[in-house]
Design a protein with these regions (language model features):
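Periplasmic/extracellular loop-to-transmembrane helix junction in inner-membrane transport proteins
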Residues: 5, 29-72
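Generic hydrophobic transmembrane alpha-helix motif, especially the helices
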Residues: 100-135, 142-143
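Glycine-rich helix-loop "coupling/hinge" segments at transmembrane-helix boundaries
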Residues: 116, 144, 191-228, 247-251
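C-terminal transmembrane helix and the adjacent membrane-cytosol boundary/short C-terminal tail
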Residues: 89, 145, 176, 222-251
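Transmembrane-helix boundary motif in ABC transporter permease subunits
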Residues: 69-99
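Transmembrane alpha-helices
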Residues: 126-130, 163-196, 222-223, 227, ...
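Transmembrane alpha-helical segments of polytopic membrane transport and secretion proteins
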Residues: 1-18, 237-251
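Short cytoplasmic-facing helical segments at TM-TM junctions of multi-pass membrane proteins
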Residues: 139-184, 205, 209
Length: 251
């Protein structure tokens, strides 16, 4: 049955997460790694403190807004660039090199540049967009090339035009690969936003992480990191479900 199969596939991952959480708590309780590794229960207690809940919610909302806007902008730019290179072969090599060069720039260096070009509040979005652009560009570019020669021969024999072939053949074969790229881009967008927030943003999880490091607030630091991880995993899980639906519709 599908439900039994789903449970069977999910069980190893769930057990692995549970084991990791137990080890985290044990290491924190025993103090093997020192004061900088607090117990998981202490981190959760910090997250649930009424005086800090509003702070965490505001920071999460700010980071999600920056990362989400950058994710959408970078994804759209990557999609358009990949389609342009696919439809106009003379642009392909130049676009690929441009994407590779942009991706090779470290996020901290990008944030420094954008700090001069745009406002401090826009820097997290800009960094996230640039890092997402490369992932989506490569995913869409690879997906558009994934149709087999036999499939292309069939459409050629039917006299299908270029744009009709793109819509009926290349886009459907591209979607599963693009969905994988969209999943991979989620943590990248969040990391880009966090790094951008370190350069003068007024709020965000990146700001909380930086302030906690500077003031040696260990529980606050781990709480912000845990919250960022949970947000990333939640979005990743949603996109995984969407990917499964897309694959079922295309098979």
């Amino acid at each position: 049955m599908p439900s039994n199969r789903w449970i069977k596939n999910a069980l190893p991952g769930a057990l692995g997460i549970l084991l990791f959480l137990l080890i985290w708590e044990l290491l924190g309780r025993t103090g093997v790694l020192g004061l900088t590794w607090p117990p998981l229960t202490s981190v959760i207690a910090t997250l649930s403190e009424p005086s800090k809940t509003a702070l965490f919610l505001r920071a999460t909302s700010a980071s999600l807004t920056s990362a989400g806007t950058g994710y959408l902008a970078g994804g759209a730019l990557g999609l358009v660039a990949a389609l342009a290179g696919h439809l106009i072969p003379t642009l392909q090599e130049g676009l690929s090199r441009f994407a590779a060069v942009v991706n090779s720039v470290p996020p901290i260096a990008l944030a420094s540049v954008f700090l001069v070009l745009v406002t401090t509040e826009s820097t997290p979005t800009a960094v996230a967009a640039i890092k997402v652009f490369f992932i989506i560009f490569i995913a869409v570019q690879s997906g558009l090339r994934s149709a087999t020669p036999a499939q292309h021969d069939l459409f050629t024999s039917l006299g299908t035009g270029r744009f009709k072939r793109l819509w009926l053949l290349e886009v459907p074969t591209m979607l599963p690969v693009a969905m994988s790229g969209l999943k991979i881009a989620v943590p990248v967008a969040l990391i880009g936003a966090f790094v951008g927030e370190w350069f003068g943003a007024s709020r965000g999880l990146g700001v909380l992480i930086l302030n906690a490091m500077q003031n040696f607030q260990i529980s606050m630091l781990w709480s912000a990191v845990l919250l960022a991880t949970l947000v990333s995993l939640a979005v990743y899980f949603i996109l995984t479900m969407v990917e499964s639906i897309v694959r079922l519709r295309l098979t």
